[in-house]
């Protein structure tokens, strides 16, 4: 057996020890601002590399999408099954102003709704709001037992499913096409669209757990900073009354005309 040097043990390390640098010294924090349709306005912070030369920190922030639980945005645990997507559109100082970018339901909520013996009905459609946002809305519904029903299952017929799906699409299109995006988001929070679908489909087949499962933004209009800032500024309350609207007292007299008469 040939005896030789073990190259691995005899070889020393090249160079000295590397300097341990803290990565966070090159980064800075920015505050995230939610639109006024939500109760919590400051919903978190985001990290970004500091401006170095021509590479601006704001360029890295614009377009970032943040997924936030609706329970955290509205301080309501009953809304914990919904997730809201907010995109960073404008930065002022250390504040990132966001806008609505999508909605979805958590996986565990969706799994809890699907049960044996009930028909699952889904519908989706592309809609356009008054402020030229193109959205794709997905709706989900489940059948429920009729009153005094003895049968354990409640499966809907294919013809009934088609009618319900058509009703879903019509209601979603009607509700979205006549409002602005901010007003449409306000409808998503209390599930007013789902309640309307449930009400109108009652004659076809009784429904339960009708939800807007997902909302995707397909196309957005050109960014208007003034409109974006309107979403983040609360309307000022009127501090004073209109003087012209107040009724004039009967005892009030014009001093100048009174002196001329005398």
Curated annotation (Swiss-Prot):
Keywords: Cytoplasm, Ribonucleoprotein, Ribosomal protein. Its main location: cytoplasm. GO terms for molecular function: structural constituent of ribosome. GO terms for biological process: translation. The keyword Cytoplasm applies. GO terms for cellular component: cytosol; cytosolic small ribosomal subunit. It is found in: Cytoplasm. Pfam families: Ribosomal_S3Ae. Belongs to the eukaryotic ribosomal protein eS1 family. Component of the small ribosomal subunit. Mature ribosomes consist of a small (40S) and a large (60S) subunit. The 40S subunit contains about 32 different proteins and 1 molecule of RNA (18S). The 60S subunit contains about 42 different proteins and 3 molecules of RNA (28S, 5.8S and 5S). Component of the ribosome, a large ribonucleoprotein complex responsible for the synthesis of proteins in the cell. The small ribosomal subunit (SSU) binds messenger RNAs (mRNAs) and translates the encoded message by selecting cognate aminoacyl-transfer RNA (tRNA) molecules. The large subunit (LSU) contains the ribosomal catalytic site termed the peptidyl transferase center (PTC), which catalyzes the formation of peptide bonds, thereby polymerizing the amino acids delivered by tRNAs into a polypeptide chain. This is Small ribosomal subunit protein eS1. It comes from Plasmodium falciparum (isolate 3D7).
């Amino acid at each position: 057996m040939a005896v030789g040097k073990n190259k691995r043990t005899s070889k020393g390390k090249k160079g000295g020890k590397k300097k341990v640098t803290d990565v966070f010294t090159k980064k800075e924090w920015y505050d995230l601002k939610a639109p006024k349709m939500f109760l919590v306005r400051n919903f978190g912070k985001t990290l970004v590399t500091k401006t170095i030369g021509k590479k601006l920190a704001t360029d890295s922030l614009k377009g970032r999408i943040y997924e936030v639980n609706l329970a955290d945005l509205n301080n309501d645990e009953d809304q914990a099954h919904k997730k809201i997507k907010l995109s960073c559109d404008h930065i002022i100082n250390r504040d990132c102003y966001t806008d609505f970018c999508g909605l979805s339901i958590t996986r565990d909520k969706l799994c809890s709704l699907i049960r044996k013996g009930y028909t699952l009905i889904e519908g989706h459609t592309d809609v356009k709001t008054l402020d030229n946002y193109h959205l794709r809305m997905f709706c989900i519904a489940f059948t429920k037992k009729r009153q005094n029903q003895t049968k354990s299952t409640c499966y809907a017929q294919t013809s009934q499913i088609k009618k319900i799906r058509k009703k879903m699409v019509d209601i979603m299109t009607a509700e979205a096409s006549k409002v602005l995006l901010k007003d449409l988001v306000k409808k998503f929070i209390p599930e007013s669209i789902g309640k309307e679908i449930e009400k109108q489909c009652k004659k076809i087949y009784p429904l339960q757990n009708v939800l807007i499962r997902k909302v995707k933004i397909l196309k957005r209009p050109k960014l208007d900073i003034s409109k974006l800032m309107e979403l983040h500024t609360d309307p000022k309350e009127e501090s004073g009354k209109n003087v012209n609207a107040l009724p004039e007292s009967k005892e009030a007299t014009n001093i100048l005309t009174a002196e001329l008469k005398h």
